[in-house]
A protein has these predicted regions:
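Beta-strand-loop-alpha-helix segment that lines the small-molecule cofactor/substrate pocket
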Residues: 11-81
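Active-site loop of classical SDR/Rossmann-like NAD(P)-dependent oxidoreductases
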Residues: 269-281
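Charged, glycine/proline-rich intrinsically disordered loops and linkers
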Residues: 33-61, 170-184, 245-267
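Contiguous beta-strand/loop segments that form the cofactor/metal-binding neighborhood of enzyme cores
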Residues: 137-245, 278-292, 309-310
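Predominantly a Rossmann-like dinucleotide-binding segment in NAD(P)-dependent oxidoreductases
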Residues: 71-185, 318
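N-terminal glycine-rich "phosphate-gripper" loop used for MgATP/nucleotide binding
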Residues: 4-8
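Redox-cofactor binding/interface segments in oxidoreductases and associated redox assembly factors
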Residues: 2-3, 26, 108
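C-terminal helix-rich "cap/oligomerization" subdomain common to oxidoreductases
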Residues: 1-2, 48, 72, 268-269, ...
Length: 324
């Protein structure tokens, strides 16, 4: 069962699928706080007033319930994090393993000009803003990379602490000309920056932002003790184009969130391949067929949920938050 449904349905649908003996693929985020513990009929704007520690508690309980129900039923819960399966990420991971180097610092971000759906502007429907919508990708990739690094040495490397800031930076745009980024965010952030401290003392910095014009950027930079890697999911320079005016290529798709065909662009030849979506689907099918776990499983989704909502606690209370 492939769960591509609103966040508030993830837990109930996963539990029903597990009870029916079905393997489960769930899109990110695994779970989110959308007021599921509040009385029915509560106004949309009241959901985001819930204290962030309570949000963390509820979202984690839902994620843990999904993991537990799959285990109890003997089925796999697979977490749809495409970054972990992108060919550029996998190759960097292979080279890092061969080098035996330590990933000391990771910087990852997913940014664009803002979601096209009005539902993304409300906590009630999304469970947060740019942090959960966008930064969840680099967070998941960093956690997976450090976990694999630890396993190669016969040890466990896990996230232990986060610090975070969030803001709606679009509010400042009112001081200038008409903005070209998405505005009108109701009660969610359009920018978030989260720092993870891992148990080996290394760090990861993840950014999610709706303030990026010119198309989506999905990047992860890994600074290791004897090498470094720049993982470019989008844009990448496999193909570059130049057009004098918009519409030069008719209705052809250039890249996600590119607002024009004019000027220099980076049309992606095969976005499903370079983004990792194709490899992710292939990996999930193979994992089920061979009866083996996958790198992006429910446990990874659970960890990302823990990190993100601990980040919201950190941002609200202005302090470091321990994860375990």
């Amino acid at each position: 069962v492939d769960l591509c449904v609103p966040n508030h349905l993830h837990r109930s649908f996963a539990e029903k699928a597990a009870a029916a003996g079905k393997h489960i693929v769930c899109t990110k985020p695994l779970t989110a706080y959308v007021g599921q513990d509040l009385p029915e009929g509560i106004a949309d704007g009241e959901v985001s007033l819930t204290p962030r520690p309570e949000m963390l508690k509820v979202a984690l309980a839902d994620a843990q319930a999904m993991v537990d129900s799959a285990k109890a039923a003997g089925v796999q819960l697979m977490y749809g994090e495409n970054w972990v399966h992108a060919p550029s990420f996998r190759r960097a991971q292979e080279l890092l393993h061969s080098s035996e180097a330590v990933a000391l610092e990771m910087r990852g971000w997913e940014t664009h000009s803002g979601s096209h759906t009005p539902y993304a502007k409300l906590w009630r429907y999304n469970g947060g803003g740019a942090l959960i919508r966008l930064a969840a990708h680099p967070i998941g990739a960093m956690v997976a990379l450090k976990k694999a690094e630890g396993q190669s040495r016969g040890e466990s490397i896990v996230p232990v602490e986060v610090t975070c800031e969030v803001a709606d930076l679009s509010l400042a745009a009112a001081a200038g000309p008409e903005p070209k980024i998405t505005t009108g965010w109701v009660d969610v952030e359009n920018w978030g920056c989260l720092t993870i401290r891992f148990s080996d003392g290394t760090r990861g910095v993840a950014i999610g932002s709706d303030n990026q014009l010119g198309g989506m950027e999905s990047h992860l930079k890994v600074l290791a003790s004897t090498c470094q890697f720049e993982i470019n999911l989008s844009p990448n320079n496999m193909l570059r184009s130049y057009a004098v005016e918009d519409g030069a290529f008719g209705e052809e798709y250039v890249m996600e969130k590119a607002s024009t065909q004019a000027g220099w662009n980076t049309p992606i030849p095969d976005e499903d391949w370079s983004s990792g979506h194709q490899a992710m689907c292939d990996e999930f099918i193979a994992a089920v067929r061979e009866g083996r776990p996958t790198a992006s499983d429910g446990e990874l989704g659970l960890e990302v949920t823990r990190i993100i909502y601990s980040g919201y606690v950190s941002a609200a209370e202005g302090r470091r938050v321990a994860l375990r």
